[in-house]
Amino acid sequence: MSEQEDQEAPKQFTFGTVGFDARFPNTNQTKHCFQSYIDYFRCIKAKGEDFVPCKQFWHAYQSLCPMEWVERWDEQRENGTFPAPI
């Protein structure tokens, strides 16, 4: 192998998901998904988008929630019809 080929070696992908949350011990993570979505937007509303602990909720709902749900919830938030207070 040439030196250039060594430098262009692809980076290894690391797959990660949200860790265990004792509030949601069952295998069905629907409630965890929804609660993480709500918690994220409550957190950034209270502390701002740059508040690092809010990212934990973001990672959780991005990992657990189907994107179709997130898109629908985003639309509902924009329209003021989201079913939970944020």
Swiss-Prot record:
The keyword Chloroplast does not apply. Its main location: mitochondrion. A motif (Cx9C motif) lies at residues 33-43. Pathway: Energy metabolism; oxidative phosphorylation. GO terms for cellular component: mitochondrial inner membrane; mitochondrion; respiratory chain complex IV. It is found in: Mitochondrion inner membrane. Keywords: Disulfide bond, Membrane, Mitochondrion, Mitochondrion inner membrane. A motif (Cx10C motif) lies at residues 54-65. Disulfide bonds join C33-C65, C43-C54. InterPro entries: COX6B-like, CX6/COA6-like_sf, Cyt_c_oxidase_su6B. GO terms for biological process: mitochondrial electron transport, cytochrome c to oxygen; proton transmembrane transport. It is a peripheral membrane protein. SUPFAM superfamilies: Cytochrome c oxidase subunit h. Residues 30-73 form the CHCH domain. It comes from the Eukaryota. Component of the cytochrome c oxidase (complex IV, CIV), a multisubunit enzyme composed of a catalytic core of 3 subunits and several supernumerary subunits. The complex exists as a monomer or a dimer and forms supercomplexes (SCs) in the inner mitochondrial membrane with ubiquinol-cytochrome c oxidoreductase (cytochrome b-c1 complex, complex III, CIII). Component of the cytochrome c oxidase, the last enzyme in the mitochondrial electron transport chain which drives oxidative phosphorylation. The respiratory chain contains 3 multisubunit complexes succinate dehydrogenase (complex II, CII), ubiquinol-cytochrome c oxidoreductase (cytochrome b-c1 complex, complex III, CIII) and cytochrome c oxidase (complex IV, CIV), that cooperate to transfer electrons derived from NADH and succinate to molecular oxygen, creating an electrochemical gradient over the inner membrane that drives transmembrane transport and the ATP synthase. Belongs to the cytochrome c oxidase subunit 6B family. This is Cytochrome c oxidase subunit 12, mitochondrial. It comes from Schizosaccharomyces pombe (strain 972 / ATCC 24843) (Fission yeast).
